[in-house]
């Protein structure tokens, strides 16, 4: 994480900007679309607008151990050494009058100010200049710390200046100095709401506190794996589980790097061509998708097996009947594929619009280089790439620089996504979609002026965007909206695929034994939405369809009085109510509960339902909670699960 000074790499980048030693470790766009962010990192950590937070004295300047920093509650951020000069020189004339111009402390302070003015700028990336900046900064820190320790007048001078910089609440102008100081930094503080549109560093999905690192760089790979390699060398662990492998620049190359290290450092007997290190990857496979055979791994973390087994316990022949029941109860038909498409677009609009803006501007710059494409507008290019990602059938493609042509698998996914996007957008010029398709596949005429590097730069960004959009759009949105049979809404699963036959299961297991015999056979993980027991209960509902139909009809009649109007609509809506009833069927305890345990159970159901409706993003969300809808939902749950006399539920 990057939320504390413990991450010395990130701290270094915030202090030293693009010229930091560790700047290359992070995927930061130092020349983003917004000019005010040039050579800066956007830090969307504030709870309110920047100006409001500043004038509420929530951002505080501090002196600490020979340097200065700012704090925002528990967050601590470094200040660039060159910016310390403004703090130290403020009211310097008064200090000189107090001590005299020839005083040793004054001469030392002036010498420190001179040293700060000669520090190489943060934009400087020449290795010798960078080394000089770090060396001289260290010397200045020690000198300043010693001066403040030895001279109480200088100490008082610094503390008084810090107090002045921190402003006076109610006097807006008193914060001008702190504002100017913050504007000099290699970061820009902003409200958390700004992140979705303007963040300029790659993250783990849309989690601002988890900055992505560039493991494709050899030095970053080696440094970031130092602890992991020590654990493996000591025999504390004998294998690795690679989380979110699709977020990597080039998953196959990364896995090869791991195995190359293991082959050199962990000599051991191997069976045939088996890799040196046992590695499982968290790879969510789409319908018909296979784990790439070229990856040096033992298999996946088992989501594919989990859903294969779960499907055995769902009556496939009851799909149409359960679909009709669901449609009738909620009062509308919800085709799953359309819902996924809309959910992915919602994520791109609400959580990841900055990534889409970057892709759109990349396309625009590339199209401007050729007269055949220059008339494609920025808006239409951004629209096209958004639609292609929304229609992308799997998490990502694996186009790389070391292949002359894309693999058939990747080409098929891209062609399919573009074809679907065209069908959904008949009013958008089809040539724009063709341009994006040919750029992704490396089929543009070299005479256009587009280089291989141009193509790879765009493809890389595209491939590292499709995965997070799929994950957030499907697992964290559509799975909470499409409630036909919620036991099928599992990580790596496809709720539109209603059950599996025994024959299909055995065929899949035979293929698994032949291709990936050591792949994990998981039935639940830390990421699953529900435990095996909850899924098993809900899986039975298609077998009890008539009883289930009568039960929910009866419950809906009984509980209709507990629904309330929120913005002229009943709350909770019928879809959330259907989810609630299935959740109770799956989670209702088998043992008798005393009053305390029952209250704990009701509270857990209540919290789960709040989480579910926020993930669904239909009436409320994590970004913009709707207190009235959530309160109505909680009242509904509490009323239904009340132990009062006369509650027939």
Label each region the model flagged.
Residues 251, 256, 260-263, 277, ...:
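Polyanionic (Asp/Glu-rich) segments that form extended negatively charged tracts
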Residues 226-240:
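Catalytic domains of carbohydrate-active enzymes, especially glycoside hydrolases
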Residues 224-227, 254-258, 580:
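Structural preference for long, well-ordered alpha-helical segments in enzyme cores
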Residues 117-159, 415-423, 433-436, 444-455, ...:
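Extended, charge-enriched "interface" segments that sit outside catalytic cores
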Residues 239-241, 280, 521-522, 580:
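Structured core elements
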Residues 240-243, 279, 393, 526, ...:
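Conserved, mostly hydrophobic/aromatic
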Residues 149-228, 321-355, 359, 525:
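Active-site cores of enzymes that catalyze phosphoryl transfer or operate on phosphate-rich substrates
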Residues 1-196, 234, 244-322:
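Acidic/aromatic-lined carbohydrate-recognition and catalytic surfaces
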């Amino acid at each position: 994480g990057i939320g504390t000074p413990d991450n010395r790499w990130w701290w270094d980048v915030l202090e030293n900007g693009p010229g930091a030693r560790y700047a290359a470790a992070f995927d930061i766009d130092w020349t983003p679309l917004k000019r005010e962010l040039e050579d800066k990192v956007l830090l969307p950590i504030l709870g309110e607008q920047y100006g409001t937070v500043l004038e509420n004295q929530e951002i505080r300047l501090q002196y600490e151990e020979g340097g200065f920093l700012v704090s925002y509650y528990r967050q601590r951020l470094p200040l660039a050494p060159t910016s310390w000069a403004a703090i130290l020189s403020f009211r310097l004339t008064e200090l000189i009058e107090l001590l005299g111009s020839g005083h040793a402390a004054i001469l030392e302070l002036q010498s420190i100010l001179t040293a700060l003015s000669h520090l190489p700028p943060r934009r400087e990336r020449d290795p010798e200049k960078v080394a000089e900046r770090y060396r001289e900064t260290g010397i200045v820190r020690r000198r300043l710390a010693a001066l403040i320790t030895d001279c109480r007048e200088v100490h008082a001078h610094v503390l008084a200046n810090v107090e002045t910089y921190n402003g006076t609440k109610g006097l807006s102008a008193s914060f001008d100095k702190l504002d100017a100081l913050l504007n000099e930094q290699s970061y820009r503080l902003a409200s958390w709401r700004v992140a979705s549109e303007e963040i300029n560093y790659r993250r783990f999905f849309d989690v601002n506190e988890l900055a992505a690192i560039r493991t494709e760089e050899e030095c970053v790979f080696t440094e970031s794996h130092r602890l992991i390699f020590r654990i493996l060398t000591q025999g504390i662990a004998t294998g690795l589980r690679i989380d979110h492998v699709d977020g990597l620049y080039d998953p196959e190359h990364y896995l090869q790097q791991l195995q190359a290290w293991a082959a050199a450092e962990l000599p051991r007997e191997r069976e045939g061509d088996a890799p040196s290190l046992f590695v499982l990857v968290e790879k969510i496979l789409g319908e018909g998708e296979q784990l790439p055979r070229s990856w040096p791994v033992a298999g996946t973390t088992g989501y594919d097996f989990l859903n294969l087994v779960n499907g055995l316990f769902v009556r496939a022949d009851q799909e149409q009947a359960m679909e009709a029941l669901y449609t009738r109860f909620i009062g509308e038909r919800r085709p799953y594929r359309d819902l996924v498409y809309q959910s992915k677009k919602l994520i791109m609009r609400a959580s990841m619009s900055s990534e889409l803006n970057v892709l759109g501007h990349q396309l625009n710059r590339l199209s401007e280089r050729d007269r055949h494409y220059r008339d494609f507008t920025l808006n239409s290019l951004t629209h096209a790439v958004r639609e292609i990602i929304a229609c992308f059938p799997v998490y990502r493609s694996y186009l790389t620089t070391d292949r002359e042509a894309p693999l058939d698998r990747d080409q098929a996914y891209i062609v399919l996504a573009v074809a679907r996007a065209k069908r959904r957008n008949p009013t958008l010029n089809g040539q724009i979609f063709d341009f994006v398709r040919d750029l992704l596949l490396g089929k543009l005429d070299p005479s256009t002026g587009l280089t291989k590097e141009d193509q790879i730069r765009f493809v890389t960004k595209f491939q590292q965007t499709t995965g997070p959009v799929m994950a957030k759009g499907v697992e964290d949105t559509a799975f909470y909206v499409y409630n036909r049979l919620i036991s099928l809404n599992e990580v790596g699963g496809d709720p539109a695929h209603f059950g599996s036959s025994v024959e299909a299961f055995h065929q899949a297991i035979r293929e698994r034994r032949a291709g990936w015999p050591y792949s994990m056979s998981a039935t639940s993980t830390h990421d699953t939405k529900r435990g095996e027991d909850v899924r098993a209960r809900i899986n039975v509902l298609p077998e009890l369809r008539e009883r289930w139909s009568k039960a929910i009809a009866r419950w809906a009649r009984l509980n209709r009085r507990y629904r309330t109007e929120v913005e002229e609509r009943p709350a909770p809506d019928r879809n959330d109510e259907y989810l609630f009833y299935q959740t109770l069927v799956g989670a209702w305890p088998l043992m008798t509960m005393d009053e305390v345990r029952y209250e704990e159970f009701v509270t857990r159901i209540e919290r789960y339902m709040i989480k579910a409706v926020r993930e669904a993003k239909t009436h409320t969300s994590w970004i913009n909670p709707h207190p009235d809808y959530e309160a109505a939902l909680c009242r509904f749950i509490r009323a239904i699960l009340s132990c009062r006399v006369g509650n027939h539920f």
